[in-house]
């Protein structure tokens, strides 16, 4: 049987705010964007998520990050 995946799309805006699935995450005071994104990705990685792609939106200086993890089938 083929592996099944679930996906998550994360939007990162030019100010470094992150939104995913209707929830917005904001940097801590004084935290740079790179450290903030790393901290966010570490949290998702601990939950089994893996980055599989980044789609930059050049004109708006923002991006979409696509993650996936194995889908857990519900027991019947």
Q: Can you say where each PLM-predicted feature lies in the sequence?
A:
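Terminus-proximal functional modules
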Residues: 1-76
